A protein has these predicted regions:
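N-terminal alpha-helical interaction blocks
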Residues: 1-81
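Short secondary-structure junctions
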Residues: 21-33, 97-98, 163-171
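N-terminal leader/targeting segments
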Residues: 72-75, 83-90, 100
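Flanking scaffold residues of small Cys/His-coordinated metal-binding clusters
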Residues: 80-83, 110-111
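Short cysteine-rich clusters marking metal-coordination/redox-active sites
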Residues: 88-91, 116-119
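Short, non-ligating residues that shape and space the ligands of small metal-coordination modules
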Residues: 96-98, 125-126
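Short linker/helix segments within small regulatory modules
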Residues: 101-115, 131-132
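Long, charge-rich boundary regions
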Residues: 117-174
Length: 174
């Protein structure tokens, strides 16, 4: 799951972790159940069954099953079959090629916005229309191997409320 640029992203993530631990969705201590970097993540806990559509698909017996939190500017897209298609919310025209080329300016933080080359509409990059879920953010939550279980919409909504931000659930197939 990812959101938009968040000032105080570490404080936001700590609040999310405390909430997830209270609901017994993740365990409190970091372990090596992640996939990236030093592999440190919060392991899956029994309460996760209550927030997914298919609890039997949760990766309880997998070594990689934890929640990783990413604090750097990242682009979150499906790993397979991402079409790089985007539309302008103002003129409703396809601008995907130009938008994805502009990421060279977005990644290092030169800008948070994109301007439609067709109508001049400027907005935060997450304000543009994407055919597939994706997100551009300095805060990301990677639930390793949870995609098949599928999150309940009520959980996604509550997660966004805790963040106090709009967010995207990007399902990554590795």
């Amino acid at each position: 799951m990812s959101g938009i640029k968040l000032p105080g992203s570490r404080a936001s993530s700590r609040a999310i972790v405390r909430w997830l631990v209270r609901k017994n969705i993740i365990k409190e201590e970091l372990t090596t159940c992640g996939r990236t970097g030093n592999r440190m993540a919060y392991a899956l806990a029994d309460g996760a069954r209550a927030v997914v559509l298919h609890p039997e698909a949760l990766p309880f017996n997998e070594p990689i099953n934890g929640l990783e939190i990413i604090y750097k500017r990242c682009i979150y897209t499906p790993a397979k079959g991402f079409l790089e298609e985007a539309g302008c919310p103002e003129c409703l025209k396809e601008v995907g090629e130009a938008l994805f080329e502009s990421l060279e300016d977005w990644m290092p933080g030169h800008t948070d916005n994109f301007t439609c080359p067709l109508c001049g509409h400027e907005d935060d990059i997450n304000g543009f229309l994407f055919l597939q879920e994706c997100g551009f953010s300095n805060l990301g939550f990677i639930f390793n191997n949870w995609a098949e279980a599928g999150f309940k919409q009520s959980f996604i909504d509550e997660f966004a409320d805790w963040l106090d931000q709009k967010m995207s659930w990007v399902k990554v197939e590795l």
